[in-house]
Curated annotation (Swiss-Prot):
Note in the entry: Present with 125 molecules/cell in log phase SD medium.
Biased composition (Basic and acidic residues): 1-17, 199-208
MF terms in GO: unfolded protein binding
Gene Ontology cellular component terms for the protein in this record: cytoplasm
InterPro entries: PDCD2_C
Presence of the UniProt keyword DNA damage in the record: no
Species: Saccharomyces cerevisiae (strain ATCC 204508 / S288c) (Baker's yeast)
This protein's UniProt keywords: Cytoplasm, rRNA processing
UniProt key word Zinc: no
Places the protein is found: Cytoplasm
Function: Required for processing of the 20S pre-rRNA at site D to generate mature 18S rRNA.
Main location: cytoplasm
Superkingdom of source: Eukaryota
Name this protein carries in UniProt: 20S rRNA accumulation protein 4
Length: 408
């Protein structure tokens, strides 16, 4: 059974985006991968070459082939996302679905999602594939400690678009709860005196840390970008993650006037009668624009993305996808149960955003470029793995749904 299908536009309005602020994490491009960078399993990045969970443990060859042309020659990595699970979150999601099997959910396990695309078979079934990899981790270190150690080793996650340069808001959404271990009330009576006495020292330390981070970033940017074979890979960039907020104003170019009107003289019509009979009898480009303007789902997509237009990935485990266009059927009803675990079901986990195309392609081509609007990934809520190899590594294929860019 094909795990990918085109979701055609429809006149129905059965779906709406309902995730709330705080539910969603966004990934943005941080910096190009450099020749000196040591890519780790814990890194999340777009393009480049996959980092498998063990050097001697790769997925079965069949999973690395295009499901349409049955060849691996044109399969390129779009995304590698380090996405370990939080047991409390997964328990709550399972309970909501009436499922109770936490046997395969361990926050200490390495868990990675790989998304590949065949550049020669766009719009064909199974031309985009997602592989979920899990590596059993017997270390006693907690996930938060592991992530903290990783960030210390490679801390270039400075948002170049954040004028405040406050890196505290950056976190890894593919790890456990980024808000765990919150500080006690800073306004409590016991803390006031200590805060006053420590404010100067903390201010100096924070200033020093900011300078060090800026210096590290500048030194990193001066390094040579890693080169890839364009026939096998897209260029690669590391990602950083933030919680979704709507504090930014929507860009002006995404704001459509409410009193938008179409000038009859701009249309390819023979007269007023044609306009009255068929008000959307336009040239192909104008007709395509008109269809998008009439698509409330696409307008919602633009509205939500407009607050954070640089996002390349949305992560909303157990939530609902932000659809690119209206669909004839309920997407969730078309997501199959995992064949390797038929008693379970899949949940939405993440979606790739169209901004990623511009970051991956050196030259954007109208004729030969990528044509997807968004790529949705659904994964097994039980995180089941049929078997692990001698290195404690296992790989399975997960479900992908693609909404393609309209050609009409």
């Amino acid at each position: 059974m094909s795990k990918i299908e085109e979701l055609p536009p429809s006149d129905t309005d059965d779906h709406s985006y309902s995730s709330k602020p705080g539910d969603v994490f966004l990934a943005f491009v941080d910096a190009p991968v450099k020749e000196t960078d040591d890519i780790l399993v814990e890194d999340s990045f777009i393009g480049g070459e996959p980092k498998w969970l063990h050097p001697d443990s790769e997925p079965p060859a069949e999973l690395l082939k295009c499901g349409a042309c049955k060849s691996a020659d044109n399969m390129k990595l779009l995304l590698q996302a380090f996405s370990p699970l939080d047991d409390e979150q997964m328990s709550a999601i399972q309970q909501r679905l009436g499922i109770n099997n936490m046997s395969y959910i361990n926050p200490q396990d390495d868990r990675v999602l790989y998304v590949f695309l065949c550049t020669e078979c766009q719009r064909k079934g199974n031309s985009v594939r997602c592989i979920r990899g899990v590596k059993k981790n017997k270390n006693v270190d907690s996930l938060s400690e592991k992530m903290a150690s990783t960030s210390l080793e490679k801390d270039f996650q400075i948002n170049p678009f954040d004028l405040s340069n406050n890196s505290d808001s950056k976190c890894n959404a593919f790890s456990s709860n980024p808000f765990g271990g919150a500080n006690a009330n800073p306004f409590g009576a016991d803390s006031i005196n200590s805060n006053i006495s420590q404010s100067k020292d903390e201010g100096k330390k924070k200033e020093s840390a900011t300078v060090s981070a800026k210096t590290a970033r500048k030194l990193h940017d001066l390094q040579k970008d890693k080169e890839y074979d364009g026939n096998k890979c897209f260029k690669s960039c590391l990602l950083y993650v933030e919680e979704e907020t709507f504090k930014n104003k929507k860009p002006a170019h995404l704001q459509l006037p409410k009193n938008l009107k179409i000038d009859k003289e701009a249309l390819d019509l023979t007269g007023d009668e044609d306009l009255e009979k068929d008000p959307i009898k336009l040239d192909p480009r104008t007709e395509k624009l008109s269809k998008f303007l009439d698509d409330d789902t696409f307008q919602k997509f633009q509205e939500v993305v407009g607050y954070n237009p640089l996002q390349v990935l949305r992560y909303d485990l157990g939530g609902k996808p932000l659809l690119y266009a209206e669909t004839k059927v309920d997407i969730l009803s078309t997501v199959p149960r995992p064949g390797y675990n038929p008693s379970s079901q899949r949940i939405f986990e993440m979606q790739l955003m169209p901004k990623m195309i511009f970051d991956l392609e050196e030259v954007v081509s109208v004729d030969n470029g990528m044509e997807w609007g968004t790529i949705l990934v659904f994964t097994d809520v039980e995180n089941y793995m049929p078997e692990f190899d001698e290195h404690g590594v296992g790989y399975v294929e997960e479900c992908v749904k693609v909404q393609w860019e309209s050609r009409t």
